[in-house]
Amino acid sequence: MARYLGPKAKLARREGTDLFLKSARRALSDKCKLDTKPGQHGRTSGSRTSDYGNQLREKQKVKRIYGVLERQFRRYFAEAERRKGNTGETLLQLLESRLDNVVYRMGFGSTRAEARQLVSHCAILLNGSPVNIPSIQVKPGDVVAIREKAKKQARITESLNLVGQMAAVTWVSVDAAKLEGTFKQVPDREDISGEINESLIVELYSR
């Protein structure tokens, strides 16, 4: 599956907010002007962005945060629409329940991209079994662990140390000594961080 391999700061500037694509040890510097669009002098437009433009921009932002491509994102939205409850909130819950995101939230990867790589390289166990599919939906009670042969990777220890300095999410529990964690529950909307206006995405797909 194709992935964006270009500068992460460029994407953050395009969306005007930190997309958390870079780890805390290499966070966006002060030189990255989030209020200036990419381009030699920052692209400007004399006209106000349309409602459609804002909706499209929000969808692009969420896709980039979670590292999901268009076709897969549409499938997530269709599934969210099929389920009972608030479609936008359910969409975010589906994205947050992806295995690569759970690995990231547990602190085993410093970014979602790094967490995805750990899964793809079979460094992760789900309920005791090795898995290599980042998009697997994790369920409440599932146990996610680092495989024995991967426990010596310095990047995992460094990532856990960084997470210890930040506010941990409440819907996962982590045993840093065992390098394993439990997905306690699907997060509520207020538990999901990030400047996301999911209602704009719902409006976009409702056109």
Swiss-Prot record:
Disordered: region residues: 31-54
Entry keyword set: Ribonucleoprotein, Ribosomal protein, RNA-binding, rRNA-binding
GO CC annotations on file: small ribosomal subunit
Domain of life: Bacteria
Bias (Polar residues): 42-53
S4 RNA-binding domain mapped to chain residues: 97-158
Pfam families tied to this protein: Ribosomal_S4 (PF00163), S4 (PF01479)
Gene Ontology annotations of biological process type: ribosomal small subunit biogenesis; translation
Gene Ontology terms for molecular function: rRNA binding; structural constituent of ribosome
InterPro entries reported for this sequence: Ribosomal_uS4, Ribosomal_uS4_bac-type, Ribosomal_uS4_CS, Ribosomal_uS4_N, S4_RNA-bd, S4_RNA-bd_sf
UniProt similarity note: Belongs to the universal ribosomal protein uS4 family.
Quaternary structure and partners: Part of the 30S ribosomal subunit. Contacts protein S5. The interaction surface between S4 and S5 is involved in control of translational fidelity.
Role according to the record: One of the primary rRNA binding proteins, it binds directly to 16S rRNA where it nucleates assembly of the body of the 30S subunit. With S5 and S12 plays an important role in translational accuracy.
Name assigned to this protein: Small ribosomal subunit protein uS4
